[in-house]
Amino acid sequence: MAQNFTKLNPQFENIIFEHDDNQMILNFGPQHPSSHGQLRLILELEGEKIIKATPEIGYLHRGCEKLGENMTYNEYMPTTDRLDYTSSTSNNYAYAYAVETLLNLEIPRRAQVIRTILLELNRMISHIFFISVHALDVGAMSVFLYAFKTREYGLDLMEDYCGARLTHNAIRIGGVPLDLPPNWLEGLKKFLGEMRECKKLIQGLLDKNRIWRMRLENVGVVTQKMAQSWGMSGIMLRGTGIAYDIRKEEPYELYKELDFDVPVGNYGDSYDRYCLYMLEIDESVRIIEQLIPMYAKTDTPIMAQNPHYISAPKEDIMTQNYALMQHFVLVAQGMRPPVGEVYAPTESPKGELGFFIHSEGEPYPHRLKIRAPSFYHIGALSDILVGQYLADAVTVIGSTNAVFGEVDR
């Protein structure tokens, strides 16, 4: 089968079919339930085995980067919620971290504690969501029901803090919008206990389930060479045995002060990746347990103090003329960062999420580029799927934990 297609015409119009009873071309998605209307795979099959896979993306493209180049820095923050919408706080933070690096802001310690707690809470919510829907795709429905019940407790905590359950907008450039509500940390401790129990329950349902293991073991194997050549990150990379975690390699916020491990896999298959998600939940619980006592030892400020870029506290805006004028200018005209470029990587639940910003000293970025992990992992399907059975395609796609809000952007 020869494929000489151009970008101007649909791919199927440019495929020359040769008479071969053992080979066929199959459209997988975008209507297939596991592709959620956002992924099309053109699969070439020989019998039941995939001999070539071509991912086609773009069904959720909204021009997020170009939007960022036409908004002020603060206006763009809620848009980042819509990238990886299962872990929106991670997107908020990655963008804020890039802008803060450009501005050279010093973040108050209480804001750092709150941010790190929110990031790890968000990581657990994202991981438990992935495990539940991945199990549902493979056919284990009970896990979905138990996991979503526990996930609701985490979403309740996010709602108590910022008022939203999915698109949080819980981070600000320079800090956080709110201090923790009364008794919020007590609710967090209770949630950590619920998460531990849920994890044990899921492991009891899956770890010794021979059907689950047959569907995942030696399926979707990623080698170290493949992971490095495709620019994989996160659990897709660590599943191959490479212990690379940006929280350890280039620590931000309070991670350099925290004691936690970076779990790695041995075989790089789908089962290894599932195990790593479960182990990372333990590490997030461990991190939050270290952060809770830190909170009481911090001072009250939760926003950086820099009148050129950050508005004064609301009490000052309501009582002081200069603070009101400065706030008006920042809202109406936007902050003007210095001329320069910055790339700030973070470890999101999916992998390396980074924002590149090129500033010309204007109220909006001259160029904004988002380095989203799911984009690279979906591209790698053209290698991972080769040699797999068609029945295992859903397992492999699910094990990448890709979210198409950040693939298409």
From Swiss-Prot:
Pfam families: Complex1_49kDa (PF00346). SUPFAM superfamilies: HydB/Nqo4-like. One of its GO terms (cellular component) is plasma membrane. The keyword Membrane applies. NDH-1 shuttles electrons from NADH, via FMN and iron-sulfur (Fe-S) centers, to quinones in the respiratory chain. The immediate electron acceptor for the enzyme in this species is believed to be ubiquinone. Couples the redox reaction to proton translocation (for every two electrons transferred, four hydrogen ions are translocated across the cytoplasmic membrane), and thus conserves the redox energy in a proton gradient. It is a peripheral membrane protein. NDH-1 is composed of 14 different subunits. Subunits NuoB, C, D, E, F, and G constitute the peripheral sector of the complex. The lineage of its organism: Bacteria, Pseudomonadati, Campylobacterota, Epsilonproteobacteria, Campylobacterales. It is found in: Cell inner membrane. It catalyses: a quinone + NADH + 5 H(+)(in) = a quinol + NAD(+) + 4 H(+)(out). Belongs to the complex I 49 kDa subunit family. One of its GO terms (molecular function) is quinone binding. Keywords: Cell inner membrane, Cell membrane, Membrane, NAD, Quinone, Translocase, Transport, Ubiquinone. It is an enzyme of class 7 (translocase). This is NADH-quinone oxidoreductase subunit D. InterPro entries: NADH_Q_OxRdtase_suD, NDH1_su_D/H, NiFe-Hase_large. Its EC number is 7.1.1.-.
